Design a protein with these regions (language model features):
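A hydrophobic alpha-helical transmembrane-helix feature that marks the membrane cores
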Residues: 1-187
Length: 187
């Protein structure tokens, strides 16, 4: 719950800032995520885990504003409620199915490929069809990540020192599901 409180603070801060801040904040967020997930042995990782929801909240404010302008308040709110329901359902699935830890590497490779293509497409114009496909792949990927992360918890693969990182994983699963469902619908 503390991540959501920090996200709320980030949303408030985002409402006070110019939308021009999104790109630098997004870059900082990506760098911090890379540090958290690939350099886990640093003493200050927990500090970064607390900073990330604030940064995500700032960018989420402007992302949500963009989709509210495109789709309207009611649809964005409906997608948010729908994302909550889907997330809970995926979590339940992850808790009841047998161990699926072997898919973790495939999910990571898919995520890295998706990130690379997303970065490339920032510099090269692409059509709505490609963006629709990318958003669809991202929705599927983060759905699978949600099932996978809950499954990791269920089968005892989360060590005590990694609890805050797993909380961050689940938080990011939800945020990415929400944003990518919005992106998919807007295409």
């Amino acid at each position: 719950t503390w991540m959501w409180a920090l996200t709320g603070i980030g949303l408030f801060i985002g409402s006070l800032l110019s939308p021009k801040i999104i790109f630098p904040i997004s870059l900082i967020t990506i760098v911090l995520l890379i540090v958290v997930f690939f350099v886990r042995n640093l003493d200050f990782i927990n500090i970064i885990v607390y900073i990330l929801p604030i940064l995500v909240g700032i960018t989420l404010f402007w992302t949500t504003q963009f989709y509210i302008e495109q789709l309207g308040n009611a649809l964005v709110f409906g997608v948010f409620i729908g994302t909550i329901l889907v997330f809970v359902l995926l979590g339940l699935i992850g808790m009841v199915i047998p161990d699926i830890s072997e898919i973790g590497n495939y999910l990571l490779v898919t995520l890295l490929v998706l990130i690379i293509f997303s970065i490339l497409f920032m510099f090269f114009p692409i059509g709505n069809t490609v963006l629709l496909v990318l958003a669809g792949i991202a929705v599927l990927l983060f759905s699978l990540y949600t099932v996978y992360d809950f499954n990791q918890i269920r089968h005892g693969y989360v060590r005590e020192r990694d609890v805050s990182l797993m909380a961050l994983n689940l938080y990011l699963d939800f945020i990415n599901l929400f944003v990518n469902i919005l992106q998919f619908i807007s295409r």
